[in-house]
Amino acid sequence: MGELPLDINIQEPRWDQSTFLGRARHFFTVTDPRNLLLSGAQLEASRNIVQNYRAGVVTPGITEDQLWRAKYVYDSAFHPDTGEKVVLIGRMSAQVPMNMTITGCMLTFYRKTPTVVFWQWVNQSFNAIVNYSNRSGDTPITVRQLGTAYVSATTGAVATALGLKSLTKHLPPLVGRFVPFAAVAAANCINIPLMRQRELQVGIPVADEAGQRLGYSVTAAKQGIFQVVISRICMAIPAMAIPPLIMDTLEKKDFLKRRPWLGAPLQVGLVGFCLVFATPLCCALFPQKSSIHISNLEPELRAQIHEQNPSVEVVYYNKGL
C-alpha cells in the first residue's frame, strides 16, 4: 500500500456541507459520545497524526479512513483556534450524555419550586461551560461577558419556569410538563445573543468563496446568531416534548404506579434516545459555513467589497454552534 497523498483537505469536514445529509453525517461523528471514553494517550496520538499531516508528514502505514478518524477525534477534544484540550464536559461529544441527564431531571422534578430552580441553574451552568470551552478565537468571550450571559440566562430560565408553573396550576397536569421546555427556549434566546454580544457590536468575519477575508459584518452576525438560536430550540423540542407525552401515559398505568422509582431513569433514557438523533440533526439544519448576498450587507461593507472585488456577489461566514 502506497503512502497517503498530502492533498486531503482535513481542514474541512469529510462530507459535503452543502447538503443536509452531509452535514448530518458530519455532526453524528462530531457528537459521538464514544469519544469521551478515549484515553489521553489516544487523544495525543490523534493530535500527532493530524498536526504531522498538516505539516506535510504522513504517519507511516496510515489509511485515509484512519486519517479522518484521527481528525474527528482531534476536533472532538481540542479547541480549533487555541489548540488547548477542552474540559471533558465542554466537548461536543459530551452534549448527549450531559443534556440527557440534565433534561431528564428537569422533566422529572418539575413540580416543586426548589428543584425547578436547581435544575435550571445546573442547565445554564453547563451551557456556560460549553460556550466558554467552544469560544471563538476571533471574538473571544471575556469573563464579564460570560458572567452577564450566565446570570441573565439563569434568571430568565428560572423566571419563565416559575411564572409558567404558577399559571399552569389550574390546567391539566400534562401542560405543566412542558414548562421546562419553555424555560430552556427563553434561556437560549437570552444566553446566545449575550454570549456573542461582541459579534453584534463589531461583526463577524466574512470571506469570499476562496476564504479571502473581506471585512466584518454585524448583519451576518445577526443572521448566524438567529440560526444558532433556532437550532438550539429545535434540538430541545424532541427531548422535551416526546418524553412528557409518553411519561404522562405510563404514569397512569399500574406498572409505574407500583414502581415509581423507575420514573426518573426511564425519563432520562427517553430523553437520551431523542437527543442521540436530535443533537446532530439540528446542528445540521444550517450550514456551518453560511452565506449571505452582499445586497443584504451594511452599505459601507458592500461598497468596500465592490471596490476590492467587483465580481463577488455572495460572502461566507462561520455561524458558530
Swiss-Prot record:
The keyword Lyase does not apply. It comes from the Eukaryota. Keywords: Acetylation, Amino-acid transport, Membrane, Mitochondrion, One-carbon metabolism, Transmembrane, Transmembrane helix, Transport. It catalyses: L-serine(in) = L-serine(out). Its main location: mitochondrion. One of its GO terms (biological process) is mitochondrial transmembrane transport. The chain crosses the membrane at residues 146-164, 174-194, 226-246, 266-286. It is found in: Mitochondrion membrane. Pfam families: SFXNs. The modification N-acetylmethionine is found at M1. It is a multi-pass membrane protein. GO terms for molecular function: L-serine transmembrane transporter activity; monoatomic ion transmembrane transporter activity; transmembrane transporter activity. Coiled coil: none annotated. The keyword Transmembrane applies. Belongs to the sideroflexin family. This is Sideroflexin-3. It comes from Homo sapiens (Human).
